[in-house]
Amino acid sequence: MTTLNLPHLRPHQLKLALLQPQIAPNTGNIARACVASGTELHLVRPLGFVLNDKNLRRSAMDYWPRLRLTVHDDSNGFFDFLRRDGARCWLFSSKGEGSLWQTRFTDGDWLIFGSETAGIAESVLAAHPGRVVRIPLAAGERCLNLAAAAAIALFEALRQILSDTMSPSRKGDL
């Protein structure tokens, strides 16, 4: 078996947010992906679990202590924070008109996901025209698990952001 000498991810400013996540193991898996990719995680209350939930910690494994985590009290405060910061946001929803494959991410973007049960509120989606993205699925299929969707979007954004920093011979290896 050949071992590839692939590059490590370089530091970046991408951020991922979960609006009112309900299922601790999903959030734990997303936290693990965030640590592994060097991405900040923001959780927006209310949460469907407590942060010391054993299922959350089990799914995040020993990655949790290294997680760069911010918890926001509510959606209104979170979106006010983003507006003040001038953040560029991408909201992921099965109702998105834009496709992940056509979205062009830049360093510093925010990837925002709704809860497992309700997704992102219609009013929030309507307030971000042109910024609502869906992950392409097979015909007739509704949606992906939140942790799977977040990982797909996160690593596609990183591929785009970081691939331009690699040597030409290694660009396809991210």
What are these regions (language model features)?
Residues 1-174:
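Post-transcriptional modification and biogenesis factors for structured RNAs
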